[in-house]
Regions:
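Macrodomain-like recognition of ADP-ribose-binding/processing modules
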Residues: 1-204
Length: 204
């Protein structure tokens, strides 16, 4: 089990990618999904901004997942899936693990909490065990919306991801390596030395 921390662009990395989604798996760039969000960048970088192609592939994988329609959500998609739903899209020589960890409100604001993030990570690791073939996993810091809650720092989702990965890897291997990528614009919000120290305590 190897863990790496990098600052940079998620989509420049090699390996399977983890992409955080809301429970509606919205993909429409604009008012529904920001072009600067991870979902927006994923659509542009990995699907050449072909929303129909991405939606078709997502729908095919989600058709057997439990869902319910929400008539109050009139913009974007209105079919909701359980928090923690994970599907694996197939790319060229790698997969994209799409994990629903937040709830998209009718006001188009995505919210989550610690319990939902933790549960979603559990499901994510299980899916990667089955379909990841023990290859390197590259993921962003999902759950950064938790940092908007007063009293909660940006490092909380980072620590949760690292803790969850290590605990679950000890139960059963997930991948040969997990690389956590921090966006350049978020670099000032974290202390990389503190993260390394936290990792050391987890390995002890």
């Amino acid at each position: 089990m190897k863990i790496g921390i990098k600052v940079g662009n998620l989509f420049d990395q090699s390996g399977h990618l983890v992409i955080g989604f809301s429970d509606t798996f919205d993909t429409e760039i604009g008012d529904v999904v920001s072009k600067d969000s991870m979902q927006g960048q994923f659509l542009v970088s990995m699907y050449s901004n072909n929303q129909n192609k991405l939606d078709t592939e997502l729908d095919a994988l989600l058709q057997n997942e439990e869902s319910e329609e929400d008539a109050t959500k009139t913009r974007g998609k209105n079919k909701r899936y359980k928090i923690g739903t994970v599907v694996a899209l197939s790319g060229q020589e790698r997969k994209f693990f799409c994990c629903a960890y937040s709830r998209m409100g009718s006001d188009l604001k995505a919210t989550s909490d610690i319990n939902n993030l933790w549960m979603s990570l559990q499901n994510l690791w299980n899916k990667i065990r089955v379909e990841g073939e023990q290859k390197t996993i590259v993921m962003p810091v999902i759950g950064t919306n938790l940092a908007r809650v007063p009293g909660i720092s940006f490092k909380l989702p980072i620590n949760l991801i690292l803790l969850s990965y290590i605990i679950n890897s000890r139960v059963e291997p997930i991948s040969k390596e997990m690389i956590l990528v921090i966006r350049k614009e978020d670099q000032e919000k974290v202390n990389l030395l503190e993260i390394q120290d936290f990792l050391k305590t987890l390995h002890n």
